[in-house]
């Protein structure tokens, strides 16, 4: 397999109901071409759809870039992220409860990406205890749809 591909070739690998993960902080390290290509493919072909979105930080630039390209009903079915303010269009859909949204502390997301890349099953951390991230409190649920889905992104381990 060729290690270099176009944005379209990469997006064509994404199928309906998959998890799409990307990173970037504001516009640094942001795969803008991939996000634009994903948006265009969804608008023109209706696929891929119902993606779970995973990002670690704050990928966007208020109105026009980053996660804002993914703000289309039917494209995203669930969000696990670190910050929504820089993705205003996506945040608006979240406020409308268009999908469950879980806002997990950025450092937890970063460590989780590293663990997944290393073949680990997950991470154990004290980060977020006694805050909204604590599974005994809000469990990172950021909207009513997250409560209504009956799931959470995190759990509590007894050691």
Place the predicted regions along the sequence by residue.
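Conserved alpha/beta enzyme-core scaffold
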Residues: 1-156
């Amino acid at each position: 397999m060729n290690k270099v591909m176009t944005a379209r070739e990469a997006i064509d690998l994404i199928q309906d109901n998959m998890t799409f993960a990307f990173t970037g902080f504001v516009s640094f390290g942001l795969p803008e071409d991939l996000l634009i290509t994903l948006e265009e493919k969804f608008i023109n072909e209706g696929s891929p759809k119902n993606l779970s979105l995973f990002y670690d930080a704050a990928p966007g630039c208020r109105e026009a870039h980053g996660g804002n390209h993914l703000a289309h009903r039917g494209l995203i079915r669930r969000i696990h992220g670190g910050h929504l303010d820089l993705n205003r269009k996506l945040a608006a859909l979240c406020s409308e409860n268009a999908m469950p949204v879980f806002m997990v502390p950025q450092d937890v997301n970063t460590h989780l990406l590293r663990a997944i890349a290393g073949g680990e099953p997950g991470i154990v951390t004290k980060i977020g205890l006694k805050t909204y991230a604590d599974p005994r409190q809000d469990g990172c649920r950021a909207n009513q749809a997250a409560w209504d889905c009956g799931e959470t992104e995190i759990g509590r381990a007894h050691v």
